[in-house]
């Protein structure tokens, strides 16, 4: 089995950091140790600057970032990361574990912002071609639970301060996309932590066996 790209997705407060740790632990138990970690937006000097622009509520002063400008900044950061970090790592046989990828844009901008989904899909295909994660773990949590957890961590970024309706639309789009794509596995992240961790271990182990590892 060659290297693979595993992405962890979900609303704020879904538990992506914990999930990443469980994925790493599971891979190591299966004898896979060569891996790197990415986050989106971010992961390169350019992408980190774009991350600051798009998430920091003070980054552009009083100027409002338009929805389309937001989308384009996410894609600029994403393609830079994919072309300069992710693809080279995979080519060398290194596994990549990502905190968010394109599914976030399809859910947050397509669902939350209500941007035309055909336009987003066209933009994705133009920028990324047929590049996709091999496995995506979507951690499903209600906005009420997720935002409560996120607020407990401290100050919220620009997107985390959106309305509950925004996150309900985002979650609905996540679920819709997960139901239509076999490479996306949904984990019930409202369960007790140990149950969530067990589900992640079981899902990743079963998926790797499916790949013939």
Swiss-Prot record:
Any one Gene Ontology molecular-function term assigned to this protein's record: dTMP kinase activity
Keywords (A to Z) from UniProt: ATP-binding, Kinase, Nucleotide biosynthesis, Nucleotide-binding, Transferase
Any one biological process term the GO annotation gives: dTDP biosynthetic process
Enzyme Commission number(s) from the entry: 2.7.4.9
A GO term from the CC aspect: cytosol
Phylogenetic lineage: Bacteria, Pseudomonadati, Pseudomonadota, Gammaproteobacteria, Enterobacterales
Functional note: Phosphorylation of dTMP to form dTDP in both de novo and salvage pathways of dTTP synthesis.
HAMAP family in the record: Thymidylate_kinase
InterPro entries in the cross-refs: P-loop_NTPase, Thymidylate_kin-like_dom, Thymidylate_kin_CS, Thymidylate_kinase
Name of protein: Thymidylate kinase
Binding site for ATP: 10-17
Catalytic EC class: transferase
Annotated catalysed reactions: dTMP + ATP = dTDP + ADP
Pfam families given in the database record: Thymidylate_kin (PF02223)
Family designation: Belongs to the thymidylate kinase family.
């Amino acid at each position: 089995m060659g290297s693979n790209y595993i992405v962890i997705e979900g609303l704020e407060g879904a538990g992506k950091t914990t999930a990443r740790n469980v994925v790493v632990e599971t891979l190591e138990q299966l004898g896979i140790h060569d891996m790197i970690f990415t986050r989106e937006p971010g992961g390169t000097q350019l992408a980190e600057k774009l991350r600051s622009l798009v998430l920091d509520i003070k980054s552009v002063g009083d100027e409002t970032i338009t929805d389309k400008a937001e989308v384009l900044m996410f894609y600029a950061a994403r393609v830079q990361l994919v072309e300069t970090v992710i693809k080279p790592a995979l080519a060398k046989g290194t596994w990549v574990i990502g905190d968010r990828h394109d599914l976030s844009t399809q859910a947050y901008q397509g669902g939350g912002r209500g941007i035309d989904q055909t336009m987003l899909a066209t933009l994705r295909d133009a920028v990324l071609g047929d590049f996709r994660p091999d496995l995506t773990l979507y951690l499903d949590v209600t906005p009420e639970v997720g935002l409560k957890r996120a607020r407990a961590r401290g100050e919220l970024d620009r997107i985390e301060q959106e309305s509950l309706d925004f996150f309900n639309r985002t979650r609905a789009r996540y679920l819709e996309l997960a139901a239509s794509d076999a490479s996306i596995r949904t984990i019930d992240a409202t369960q007790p932590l140990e149950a969530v961790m067990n589900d992640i271990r079981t899902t990743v182990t079963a998926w790797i066996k499916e790949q013939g590892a």
